UniProtKB/Swiss-Prot annotation:
Keywords: Cell inner membrane, Cell membrane, Membrane, NAD, Quinone, Translocase, Transport, Ubiquinone. This is NADH-quinone oxidoreductase subunit C. Its main location: membrane. The keyword NAD applies. It comes from Ralstonia pickettii (strain 12J).
Amino acid sequence: MTDKLATLKAALEKALGNRVQSLTESVGELTLVVKAADYLDAMRTLRDDASLKFEQLMDLCGVDYADYGDGAWNGPRFAAVSHLLSITHNWRVRVRVFAPDDDLPVVSSVTTIWNSADWFEREAFDLYGLVFEGHPDLRRILTDYGFIGHPFRKDFPVSGYVEMRYDPVQRRVVYQPVTIEPREITPRVIREDQYGGLKH
C-alpha cells in the first residue's frame, strides 16, 4: 500500500470509526463497506469531514451478487456502489452498501448530499430494482414505460419476456411474447487441402 493510500485509510478509519464494516485495498484503490443503517451518515461524513473532503460523486451503480464467485457468495444479494473523488486531497474511494432485504432491496438516497446521484439512483432502480429511500423522483429512466422486471438482475432472462414490433394493421407499436427461433450457431468450417499454401 502506498503512503497516500495509507494516509487515506487512516483518515477514513478515524473519521468513520465503528461505521466502517470493512476497508480493503485492491489495485491501488480502497473499498469501504458500510451498513445500510449507517450509509447516509457515513456518506455525509465523507463529504464534510475536513480530512476527507469527498466533494464529488463520480458514479453510483447497482450490483447483483447472485451466483457471485460461482455460487460461493453467501451475503446479501444487492448492493449500491459509489465512487467518490476528493478534489482537495486528490484521492478516490469506492463505497459499497448492501441492501439488508433481498426481496425488497432498500438503501438511503444520497441525493441530498450529492445531487448528481439523482439519475444514477434512478438507473440502479430501473435495472436492478434497488429502492433508494428519500429519492425525490424514483422512476424508470432507461426501460420502456410498461416494462416488467429489472433487466440487469441475474435471474432476468437474457431474451426478456416480451418483444416490441410495429404492427402495420394496427398502425402502432405492440408488445408480444418473445418468439425465438432455434438456429444453428456453430460456424460451418470448410477444410481445403492446400488452403493458404500449407500442405497437410
